[in-house]
């Protein structure tokens, strides 16, 4: 769900909720008039209109999750007929399918897939560029990031919502 400001955090852990509220409301030490911060905090307060939007969407959360899950299963079934790996939840975890991804065999396969899908009306994109490759972080220390680079060259984010019938455009292709 979205509230127009990036979403919301939901938990059934009271301690985690208290901690999250503290960090997201500037980490200010309680005091009647002084502003003292004892750690790095953020100003992520949610305006009432955004909160109302979030509350309305919460009433439909199960519906949203069912739609995302159905599409993820359609992707997984479609992709299962290929040699591409669909990224799935690990162990006993349950994915929300906000972002689906696949792993291709090479950078060349990734680029070919991106070109094919985007030119056929399904927007796909490579995973985010590594932070160490962004100008503002290029001089920061890293350990070579071998695994991250391997993934960057192969992982594609696929849509978590597509128009009905859009996946049928992609019949089996000749290898």
Model-derived features with residue positions:
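PLP-dependent aminotransferase class I/II
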Residues: 12-175
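Glycine-rich phosphate-binding loop of ATP-grasp-fold ATP-dependent ligases
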Residues: 4-9
């Amino acid at each position: 769900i979205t509230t127009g400001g990036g979403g919301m955090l939901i938990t059934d852990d009271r301690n985690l909720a208290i901690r999250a509220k503290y960090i997201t409301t500037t980490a200010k030490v309680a005091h009647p008039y002084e502003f003292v911060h004892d750690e790095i905090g953020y100003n992520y307060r949610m305006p009432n209109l955004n909160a109302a939007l979030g509350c309305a969407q919460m009433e439909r959360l199960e519906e949203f999750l069912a739609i995302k899950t159905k599409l993820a299963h359609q992707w997984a079934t479609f992709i299962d007929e290929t040699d591409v790996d669909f990224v799935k939840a690990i162990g006993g975890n349950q994915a929300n399918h906000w972002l689906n991804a696949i792993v291709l065999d090479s950078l060349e396969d990734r680029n070919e897939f991106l070109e094919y899908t985007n030119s056929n009306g399904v927007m796909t994109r490579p995973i985010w560029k590594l932070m160490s490759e962004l100008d503002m972080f290029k001089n920061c220390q890293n350990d070579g990031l071998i695994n991250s680079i391997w993934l960057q060259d192969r992982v594609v984010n696929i849509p978590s919502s597509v128009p009905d019938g859009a996946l049928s455009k992609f019949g089996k292709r000749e290898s």
